[in-house]
Design a protein with these regions (language model features):
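Extracytoplasmic
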Residues: 29-56, 60-62
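C-terminal ends and interior cores of transmembrane alpha-helices
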Residues: 101-121
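Helix-to-loop junctions at the C-terminal end of transmembrane segments
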Residues: 79-91
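Residue-level signature of mid-helix packing/kink "hotspots" within the transmembrane helices
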Residues: 46, 73-81
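Hydrophobic core of transmembrane alpha-helices in multi-pass small-molecule transporters
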Residues: 120-142
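Juxtamembrane helix-start elements in MFS-like secondary transporters
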Residues: 61-69, 125
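Helical-face signature of the major facilitator-like transporter fold
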Residues: 34-38, 42, 73, 129-137
Length: 142
């Protein structure tokens, strides 16, 4: 089931005369992939903190939203610790984008508690947002 995360097959070493030219392009590909990927993770992770002032208009207090925000930090720390060994045994070309897509999808569902639970169900909305933000933090740790 998880074969798509398996590390790629070992490639033969390049001849010595081709190493410099091939590695120049690889350096840029790796740098841009990591830079864009990490920037995407950062934007997804910090998205909720920018929405906190707007959520106050819907009756949420900053103290309640800080609990939701702290779930992200807890999940991120746990995920970095636990998913590190998983990522070492995985294909980084699949693992990083998978984490980014899952984090973005989880963040897109953050509107559901605000839209579908009214002020009378604020505690349920906080719980759903906390679970979703935990998932965002977990996937960001991938």
């Amino acid at each position: 089931m998880w074969n798509f995360l398996a590390p790629p097959a070992h490639k033969q070493e390049l001849p010595a005369e081709k190493i410099d030219s091939a590695y120049k392009s690889y350096r840029w590909q790796v740098f841009l992939g990591i830079f864009i990927g990490y920037a995407g993770f950062y934007i997804v992770r910090k998205n909720f903190s920018m929405a906190i002032p707007e959520l106050a208009q819907f009756g949420f207090e900053k103290g309640e939203l800080s609990i939701v925000l702290s779930m992200n930090a807890v999940a991120y720390a746990l995920s970095k610790f636990l998913m590190g060994s998983v990522s070492d045994r995985s294909n980084a070309r699949v693992f990083l984008p998978l984490g980014l897509v899952l984090a973005a999808v989880s963040m897109m569902f953050m509107i559901v508690p605000v839209q579908f639970f009214g002020p009378e169900q604020k505690s349920l909305a906080i719980i759903v947002m906390a679970v979703l933000n935990f998932l965002v933090g977990w996937f960001n740790g991938m």
